Amino acid sequence: MNFAAALRWWRLSLPIADELEESLIWKLTDLGLCRLAVQHAPENSERTLLAWLPSSEWSESDRDQLMANLRPLAEPFGLKLANPTWCEVADEDWSLNWKQDWQPDPVGQRLLILPAWLDLPQEYADRFVVRLDPGSAFGTGSHPSTRLCLEALERNPPLGLRVADLGCGSGVLGFAALAFGARQVLAADTDCQAVCASRANTELNQLDLDRLRVVHGSVEALSAQLEGQTVDLLLCNILAPVIEVLAPSFDQLLSANGRGLLSGLLVKQAPRLQMVLEALGWRVNCLTEQGCWGLLDVSKR
């Protein structure tokens, strides 16, 4: 008997605004749910978050409690979560749900995020191409916080620099940094699935594994890889409260003249984060905004 095929799941379908994607995925992952997908096209702001929960483990009251845990995440954006749709389904290939809607995604003037299973469209032949198959790690380049980082890399290319990518997800920021001239990228993520996805995408982009080295962990793991050396640029696209916790250890990674691109924060969270960073001896050079999301460009004083 094929026990995997016999499994049944509650499939959650939840329409969401793009501002909520990152926070909801973070929360669901933190709750131990890893069968997740987001359906959307790059040109369409309408998105549907999908999650699969083992039906034998999730009663109606458990599912109601899950939604109660998710609803507060919409409040900082002045939004309310839509009503969820629950459907009991047989085992299905959940990882393919988002693939059917993902198309080639031009970013800025020079970069193209290309799904691994699609051919390069001729109209984008002059762009730097980053091929991605995120698997179960999120980071397709479509989220505003990711795009802020990608566009910042294009505006100020990291030519010849050594780069650290903290919270790398699918590896998209590291691949873009290399495309724009970085010498080497050291990447880390606390999610094992993200580490696996980044390593697989390194091979997909035909890169030497030493040019983009991926480790499991956080600042300490990157510091160990550096063996007493430092990087010139830190990319950190994670939620603002996490940046605040990690910020005191950024000195372990960055050189005296190093810069950081800190994204994943709401614009209204920027003043508090700026205050925290300045108290630690950092200078905030500028805040770039895209919708309600922001990116802080920081350097040492």
UniProtKB/Swiss-Prot annotation:
Swiss-Prot/TrEMBL keywords: Cytoplasm, Methyltransferase, S-adenosyl-L-methionine, Transferase
Compartments where found: Cytoplasm
GO MF entries: protein-lysine N-methyltransferase activity
Binding-site residues, S-adenosyl-L-methionine: T146, G167, D189, N237
GO process annotations (BP): methylation
Catalytic activity, as annotated: L-lysyl-[protein] + 3 S-adenosyl-L-methionine = N(6),N(6),N(6)-trimethyl-L-lysyl-[protein] + 3 S-adenosyl-L-homocysteine + 3 H(+)
Cellular compartments per GO CC: cytoplasm
CDD domains to which the protein is assigned, alphabetical: AdoMet_MTases
Enzyme nomenclature, EC number: 2.1.1.-
Database matches in InterPro entries: Ribosomal_L11_MeTrfase_PrmA (IPR050078), Ribosomal_PrmA_MeTrfase (IPR004498), SAM-dependent_MTases_sf (IPR029063)
Principal EC category: transferase
Its job: Methylates ribosomal protein L11.
Family: Belongs to the methyltransferase superfamily. PrmA family.
UniProt protein name: Ribosomal protein L11 methyltransferase
Species of origin: Prochlorococcus marinus (strain MIT 9313)
